[in-house]
A protein has these predicted regions:
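N-terminal Rossmann-like dinucleotide-binding module
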Residues: 1-23
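Active-site loop of classical SDR/Rossmann-like NAD(P)-dependent oxidoreductases
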Residues: 9-13, 258-270
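Conserved SAM-binding strand-loop segment of SAM-dependent methyltransferases
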Residues: 25-32
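Beta-strand-loop-alpha-helix segment that lines the small-molecule cofactor/substrate pocket
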Residues: 43, 49-50, 54-101
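C-terminal helix-rich "cap/oligomerization" subdomain common to oxidoreductases
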Residues: 43-45, 81, 192, 237, ...
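Hydrophobic residues in well-ordered beta-strands that form the structural core
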Residues: 69-70, 94-96, 125, 199, ...
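Predominantly a Rossmann-like dinucleotide-binding segment in NAD(P)-dependent oxidoreductases
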Residues: 100-179, 185, 307
Length: 319
């Protein structure tokens, strides 16, 4: 993999990339059209603001490039389906970088659920707490439920191996906090067959912050599992802070060994993308697969706005 061009409408951003030694001035462009026309490229990495994702992804696909796009994919289901269909029609890979999947604690939790190592899963509690009263986040669209919550909603689907059926959410925006949209929320997500997830998230907690993936407690027939992932010191080759503990009924807690991963986080997502392109296979978290996570995030927002449960379409029938 080689970085051949950098696109940004802001000259100061391109200058900063050059100063950092990431790229040369000859490889900097003000628009994706200019870059694609001038450079030989196989794929495009889209890291713009979420509201701009659709236009940039559309332009890259139109030029027959594979695309890896930052989460959240886009801000509406209609646009998401349009881009998924466009990628399929052009036989291009379109993947969403749900980078929280690429951590060892997540893989261990997936294995425990899939292998029914403690019997059937019954219920999950997830808590996310951070204090992020910073100016650039105050005016983001739904800084918790969409921008941050998309990570947690995607992990629910990835770890449980199920699709959500309904979501009932309430959000809070205290008048003193300065956010345009609610920075706190609580939700109950029904995954069918008696499996529910209780989710609580907040950007207003200065004390006892959780890791970025949150604190998970999973209740099974034969015990419970607690885990957390993506601590503050996590990096491209580090998963410091990842931990999984298993509590079988009648036994002492056991902090289990975690699976080995070569790369983590965004590097893990990028590696999965490039490996899939090289092998001609389908990567994890394609845009089509990601429809379920986006539908859950947007459904939680709708539920919070109308203060009623919202029925969700699964990824199997959302097309």
């Amino acid at each position: 993999m080689e970085l051949v061009a950098c696109v940004d409408a802001r000259p100061e951003a391109l200058e900063a990339a050059c100063d950092a030694g990431v790229i040369t001035a000859r490889q900097c462009y003000p628009s994706i059209g200019d870059a694609i026309e001038d450079q030989k490229t196989d794929a495009v990495l889209v890291t713009t603001d979420g509201a701009q994702h659709g236009d940039v992804v559309r332009a890259a696909l139109r030029a027959r490039k594979h695309v890896l796009v930052e989460k959240p994919f886009v801000e509406s289901m209609a646009e998401a389906r349009e881009l998924v269909d466009q990628a399929a029609a052009l036989n291009r890979t379109l993947m969403v970088s749900q980078n929280y999947r690429f951590f060892p604690a997540v893989r261990a939790a997936q294995r425990i659920v899939k292998g029914q190592e403690l019997g059937q899963l019954l219920h999950v509690d997830i808590d996310f707490r951070r204090f992020a009263h910073v100016s650039h986040r105050l005016h983001w669209r739904h800084p918790l439920l969409l921008d941050m919550g998309i990570h947690h909603f995607d992990l629910m689907r990835a770890v449980l191996g199920r699709e959500p059926r309904t979501v009932d959410c309430r959000a809070c925006n205290p008048p003193w906090c300065g956010y345009s949209d609610p920075p706190e929320a609580a939700a109950i997500v029904d995954f069918g067959d008696g499996v529910t997830v209780s989710y609580r998230g907040s950007w207003l907690h200065p004390e006892r912050p959780t890791a970025w993936a949150g604190e998970w407690l999973m209740e099974f027939e034969q015990g419970t599992v607690t885990w957390t992932s993506r601590g503050d010191r996590s990096g491209l080759r580090s998963a410091e802070g990842d931990a999984v503990s298993v509590y079988r009924h009648g036994t002492v807690p056991d902090r289990i060994a975690l699976p080995h991963l070569e790369l983590f986080d965004r590097a893990g997502a990028l590696d999965a993308f490039t490996r899939a392109l090289a092998a001609g296979t389908t990567p994890e978290s394609t845009a089509g697969e990601n429809l379920g996570s986006l539908a859950l995030a947007l459904g939680a927002i709708r539920s919070a706005e109308c203060r009623e449960p919202v029925q969700l379409m699964t990824s199997a029938n959302s097309r």
